[in-house]
């Protein structure tokens, strides 16, 4: 959406509307569960920013699977949000995610902001830890090309490629018949 409005009722309830690109006003609940969850997260962070303006404490927020029910593009934008809040307000986030889009976005931001080559001047705010079933957790360090120095376990990054290869094999099999 382009904008939003909140209408309060005697401090007990509220209506939350989202103004879409066409100028239509929609209830947030009609936008889907993912949008609702993302907006609640954003409003909570905004509240903490307001509260923290006076205290100026270093805050670390734990966020569990914020990508649930979100369109891939919004998952990516959520990573932008975490990055901007970190940059502007110094909040740190520990995010548990299974989202390839969010992880890939950290790689892109790290390259765009030159976090990888100039660690002394411009430290990388992103740290990726992969929890491997057999090997246990390990850090996925960024290389200068924006890739990771280690692989994720099977079924994470390679799943899309694996399915594509299976489709190609199936198409070739069907064409041979």
What residue spans do the PLM features occupy?
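ABC-family P-loop ATPase nucleotide-binding domains
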Residues: 1-7
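Switch/communication elements of ASCE P-loop NTPase nucleotide-binding domains
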Residues: 7-165
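Conserved helicase/translocase motor-coupling segment
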Residues: 172-177
